[in-house]
Structures are given as C-alpha cells and as structure tokens.
C-alpha cells in the first residue's frame, strides 16, 4: 500500500474516533468531586443537601438527569428506587440532581423516586463544576452518573442520554468499593 493511502486511512480512523467520542466531557475518574450545598427533597419534604455530609456515610451515587417527569427521567428514577436495597447492601447512597425547582422535586421524590432516595436542585455552578450541561439544551443537565468514594474522588462516570445502563453501572461500581 502506498504511503499516502496509509496516511489517509490513519487520518480517517483518527477522525472517526474523535467523532465517536461523547459530546459531553464529564469529570474524569480520579478527579476530586466538587463540593456543593443545595436544597432537595426526600419523600416530599425539603432538606439541605451538602456533598461532604453525604460522603461521611460512605460512597455516593450522584446522578444527573435532564428533567423531572419526562419519560426517561421518570423510568430512571423508578429503576434507582427499585434497586435501593442493593445500593444499601453495597453501602452506597443515591442522590438524583437536575435543574428542576424545589416544588417539582418534592413531587418527583414521592411519585418517581417512591420516597426511596433524595433528589436535589443542581445550581448553574454545580452543573458547570460537574461538567453536565446538556449541549442541546443548556438550561438542562446531561444524563451523567458519578460514583464518588467517601474521600471525595470520582471512581466511576457514565454519561449517556439513554437511562437504561445507569443503575447497573453505578451499582456495580458501588459494590466494587465494598470489596
């Protein structure tokens, strides 16, 4: 094969890999999770959520979802709620976050999350710090799940608008931390 043809193939492969990369660039594994405080809801009741307080109890699954009561976000919340016994067994807590207001989150915490885990408001600063701006709609968060160890380090990241793998991947990472 002539040298120029080989070069074109390599350039083509490189371009393909770059185009196949995810559009969002989440925090990398090993990064320190940015600390934050915000308001949230659990079982319809408001509360203040502080990342450092959550980490005192063990690893945390912090999952960002675009908008409460949309089909994918509701199905994802129900899947996390169904898996809460396994997350507890692994010693992990779960918190969902979106840019929704507190009144919406109060309803979502009971109807979709089934009173099993809290959801909280992601401020613009938190959305930026966790690099979860939804590129197509910047007022929303991307669907990105983080598993953060009790020292505050990101040990797993999964960013995909399809909600289906988020629960299984975060649970596997939480279980691996327990070993």
Residue ranges of model-derived segments:
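Cleaved targeting-peptide boundary
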Residues: 22-32
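Bacterial N-terminal signal peptides
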Residues: 10-22
């Amino acid at each position: 094969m002539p040298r120029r043809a080989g070069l074109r193939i390599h350039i083509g492969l490189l371009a393909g890999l770059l185009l196949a990369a995810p559009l969002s660039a989440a925090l990398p594994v090993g990064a320190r999770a940015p600390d934050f405080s915000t308001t949230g809801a659990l079982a319809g009741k408001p509360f203040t959520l502080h990342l450092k307080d959550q980490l005192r109890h063990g690893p945390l699954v912090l999952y960002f979802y675009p908008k409460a009561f949309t089909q994918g976000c509701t199905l994802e919340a129900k899947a996390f709620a169904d898996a809460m016994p396994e997350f507890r067994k692994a010693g992990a807590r779960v918190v969902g976050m979106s840019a929704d207001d507190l009144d919406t989150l109060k309803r979502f915490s009971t109807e979709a999350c089934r009173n099993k885990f809290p959801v909280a408001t992601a401020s613009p600063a938190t959305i930026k710090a966790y690099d979860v701006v939804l590129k197509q709609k910047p007022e929303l968060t991307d669907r990105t799940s983080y598993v953060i160890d009790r020292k505050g380090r990101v040990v797993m990241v999964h960013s995909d608008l399809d909600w289906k793998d988020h629960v299984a991947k975060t649970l596997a990472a939480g279980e691996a931390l327990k070993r």
